Amino acid sequence: MTKIRIQVLALLALTSTLTYAQEDNKKGYLTGSFETNTIYYKDDSKTEAESPEDHFGSNNYLKLDYYQGKFAVGVQLEAYEPVLVGYPAELEKAKLTNYYVSWADKDFSVTAGTFYEQFGSGLLFRSWEDRMLGLNNAVMGARFTYNYKNIVGLKAIWGTPRFGMDFSDTQVRGIDVSFSLSEMLSWQNTSLSIEGGALNRYEKISIDLEEEGGKPYSNGFSGRVNFERSGFTAKGEYVDGGNKYYDFIHDDKLYAKKRANAQLLELGYSGNGLGINLTGRRLEWMNSEIIAGNGSTSNLLNYVPAMSTQYTYMLTNLHPHTPQTGEVT
């Protein structure tokens, strides 16, 4: 199958100003972007690969955000006419998928509608968008953040994650807290912080699973330590992902219960023209899903950080590594 690809990214410098009859004129402004990823497919006689029936695929995104002082409101329209080959099948047709309103100042913010968030490295929880992979698990609900003198940071979320073009029935509730000892003690050349998060996931379960002792909710938590001094960095994270239930027919049991957990350690040094990074981790049953048992590649509620470097402008650096949800590396 031969592909003729058209990629367009249009940044719309849309700026509108609203002036008030006050000494302090406050201005609002609008920003927007439009992206289309369109491919025309042709049959490939050499490989005998056949193109789709309509020979066409197009992923399109229109994003608009309006800012007025501490307030912001935004929408995102997506159209898959049809979705490109290899992308999740649940992405189809056109729909207003994301919309939000928020208020934020220096130390406090609140958002209602869709939002993205991450706890720690993302092993416990991450909602994000990656258009090249067809991923968007934005949460529809509410988010609250607070920062006290860069000493204490707090995030609290509640909502339902997006799956495909709609929002799932699964509910997530979580809180993440960071405490900076170095800021509290006014250390000049050292940074030390202790962080932790907790996440509750709720999804209705089948009668069979309930009869075998399954629960519709799972509770996970994480603990993290970050240290930096004179070019040296050290980061450690422990994650308990909560109970997972898997289809498992053995000894009259339909499901197997597993406890998800992970350990992550990152060490680094940068200075004097030298940079070194060492990463070690252990993962066990760390696949966190929006909809239990759904095999879609977009059915993700967390993120397993890659072990390989993330750039490919040098051929010698192109050694991709696919993260697994159960491994020691």
Task: For each feature predicted by the language model, list its residue ranges.
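Outer-membrane beta-barrel pore proteins
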Residues: 116-120, 146-148
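Bacterial Sec-dependent N-terminal signal peptides
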Residues: 1-30
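A short acidic, glycine/proline-enriched capping/turn motif at secondary-structure boundaries
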Residues: 82, 108, 117-119
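Signature for the C-terminal beta-barrel architecture of outer-membrane proteins
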Residues: 23-30, 35-57, 66-67, 71-73, ...
